[in-house]
């Protein structure tokens, strides 16, 4: 049964400006494991990775119906690339959900869609 569907899109230039102004933004959005994947990239690909993860986490919060705040933070949701290249969502052990995520990029933006199944 589908619990929710979320969609988010973000401008790459906006993410780049935020990171330039506040580099700690990366640590607020990404988990330690995600940061290790992020650090493997160079230049604009880093911004694409960060923006894609940000959009995916926002899409998750929308699909969950909670948004981010008191009960959910960006680092509660971890999205890692698995061996075949797909993004895989890891949640706290008590979540009891199946989460499907798709992330895409253009030259100017990143977008993600999340479907939560219970």
Curated annotation (Swiss-Prot):
One Gene Ontology term from the biological process aspect of the record: fatty acid biosynthetic process
Keyword set includes Lipid biosynthesis: yes
This enzyme's EC code(s): 2.7.8.7
Binding site for Mg(2+): 8, 58
GO CC terms of this entry: cytoplasm
Catalytic activity: apo-[ACP] + CoA = holo-[ACP] + adenosine 3',5'-bisphosphate + H(+)
Keyword terms of this UniProt record: Cytoplasm, Fatty acid biosynthesis, Fatty acid metabolism, Lipid biosynthesis, Lipid metabolism, Magnesium, Metal-binding, Transferase
Short name of one Pfam family: ACPS
GO terms, molecular function: holo-[acyl-carrier-protein] synthase activity; magnesium ion binding
Cofactor(s) listed in the protein's UniProt record: Mg(2+)
InterPro entries: 4-PPantetheinyl_Trfase_dom, 4-PPantetheinyl_Trfase_dom_sf, ACPS, Ppantetheine-prot_Trfase_dom
Matching HAMAP family: AcpS
Family in the record: Belongs to the P-Pant transferase superfamily. AcpS family.
Protein name as it appears in the record: Holo-[acyl-carrier-protein] synthase
């Amino acid at each position: 049964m589908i619990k929710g569907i979320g969609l988010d899109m973000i401008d790459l230039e906006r993410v780049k400006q935020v990171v330039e102004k506040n580099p700690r933004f990366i640590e607020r959005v990404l988990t330690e494991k995600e940061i290790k994947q992020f650090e493997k990239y160079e230049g604009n690909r880093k911004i694409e990775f960060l923006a894609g993860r940000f959009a995916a986490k926002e899409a998750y919060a929308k699909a969950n119906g909670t948004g981010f705040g008191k009960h959910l933070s960006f680092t509660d949701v971890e999205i890692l690339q698995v061996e075949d290249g797909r993004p895989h969502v890891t949640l706290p052990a008590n979540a009891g959900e199946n989460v499907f995520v798709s992330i895409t990029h253009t030259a100017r933006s990143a977008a993600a869609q999340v479907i939560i199944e219970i």
